Amino acid sequence: MKFQKYYGIPKDAKYGEEFMGRFPILFQDNKKSMQETCMCWGIDCPIGWYHILEQLCTYLEFHNQQFSKEYGIAVVADQVKEKFGTLRFYFSIAFVDKETGLKVGPDDENDETTSETAALYVARDYLDMLADEAIGEAEMMTEDTCADCGVPLTKDNKVETEGWITFLCDECNAKREEEYANRLNHQENVEQKS
């Protein structure tokens, strides 16, 4: 998959129900309990990656629509989060209803290998490969994208914060440092008054 370069973050961008609702097959587990899925927590990523996640999810949902109708399989998100400064997108290939795209249990009653089941396994492996490649590319892109504003990072403007790993541009890093200094000053003033 080829991702487009940064095209900006919409002012109303967020990863809530509306975002996930645009990709109903991919995010079909987001309303399930925490005993069933980590998607109950939603998408836990910096807003600076919005354009990357939007393109990735559009790509995966496109393939989901094709593979669910043809083979009854789809990519279903298990967890989407930031970890160590980059995207982590965990998924599974699920058996789905060919009409609705919603998960169904596998047909375990027939253990025979037929040409139809052989084609299904080939399709499943191919869909898994497509998803792995696209997700891998997206994960690498997040390392070179400012977590706050989404601009592409280069070795000249990339700052890796200490402690909690985050990749920021110089401008966003300066804003965070200023906010942190202001919080420290406020805390010191409160402590002096008491």
Where are these regions (language model features)?
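Short metal-binding segments enriched for Cys and/or His
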Residues: 174-189
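Short metal-coordination and nucleic-acid-contact micro-motifs, chiefly zinc-binding Cys/His arrays
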Residues: 141-145, 162-165
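Cysteine-rich micro-motifs
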Residues: 162-175
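Interaction interfaces in information-processing and related assembly proteins
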Residues: 17, 21, 29, 33-35, ...
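Short Cys/His-rich "knuckle" micro-motifs
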Residues: 156-161, 179-181
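Short cysteine-rich clusters marking metal-coordination/redox-active sites
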Residues: 146-149, 169
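Cys/His-rich microdomains that often coordinate metals
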Residues: 153-155, 173-176
